[in-house]
């Protein structure tokens, strides 16, 4: 699944020796980095057979720049859609923030002065599988990225052979209780299920919105998403998409005997 999505090796004017480290070994090391949040300098390259830390890091930087992990998620969603594993009856959106200890594009979250933070917002289907993901500064209101979050849901194949990117309903908490968000859902023909400020209780997540919280906990299983150590936004987003790819792959029917750790 990954090999057809990889970009060709970069060419240099001076030439050079061909690559001897396999893409599979580098991918295993990158997945280890995402799961454990180990510093690059402490990567056990001998266990994965990926040559050196520099070789693995360069391969990851090339793949992140080429958008390999985003395209991998689309390919996995296509397989899940054809197998009937996606629940389009509803989609739930939520966000979570994390510290950016080395700075980078972002902002300070209100109420937490002195801490640079970023915010990640996943959109999940009725079963909790991530369909889209956005990474923004922590001081940006959730409602401002609502349209972009739903608009990033790719057109996924269905068991009937067509493609679909529009859910029947959208569930969200009070952070998305804006006229802009409700109007956007109405224009797209999506039923509005957004908690209203001053009406719905904050003590309960509801019968469906809890799945977004559960998906956030699943994503946090990749420790690289608990604290941001990467200064480069492109590489951090690649790690976030890799966490989504891991969830999608483990839901495939063929992955019952070969689940990713």
PLM regions and their residue ranges:
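Short alpha-helical elements
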Residues: 1-261
């Amino acid at each position: 699944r990954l090999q057809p999505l990889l970009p060709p090796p970069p060419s240099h004017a001076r030439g050079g020796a061909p690559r001897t480290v396999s893409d599979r070994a580098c991918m295993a090391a990158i997945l280890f980095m995402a799961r454990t949040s180990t510093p690059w300098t402490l990567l056990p390259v001998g266990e994965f057979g990926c040559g050196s830390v520099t070789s693995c890091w360069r391969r990851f930087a090339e793949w992140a720049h080429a958008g390999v992990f985003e395209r991998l998620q689309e390919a996995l969603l296509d397989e899940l859609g054809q197998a009937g594993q996606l629940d389009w009856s509803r989609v739930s959106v939520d966000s979570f923030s994390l510290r950016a200890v080395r700075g980078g594009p972002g902002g300070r979250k209100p109420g937490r002065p002195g801490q640079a933070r970023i915010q990640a917002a996943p959109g999940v289907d009725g079963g909790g599988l991530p369909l889209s993901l956005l990474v923004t500064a922590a001081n940006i209101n959730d409602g401002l990225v609502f349209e972009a979050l739903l608009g990033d849901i790719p057109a996924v194949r269905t068991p009937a052979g067509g493609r679909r990117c529009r859910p029947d309903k959208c569930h969200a908490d009070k952070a998305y209780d804006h006229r802009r968000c409700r109007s956007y859902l109405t224009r797209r023909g999506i039923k509005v299920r957004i908690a209203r400020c001053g009406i719905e209780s904050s003590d309960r997540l509801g019968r469906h919105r809890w799945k977004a919280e559960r998906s956030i906990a699943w994503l946090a299983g990749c420790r690289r998403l608990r604290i941001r150590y990467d200064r480069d936004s492109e590489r951090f987003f690649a790690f976030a998409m890799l966490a989504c790819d891991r969830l999608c792959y483990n839901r495939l029917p063929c992955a019952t005997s070969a689940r990713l750790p």
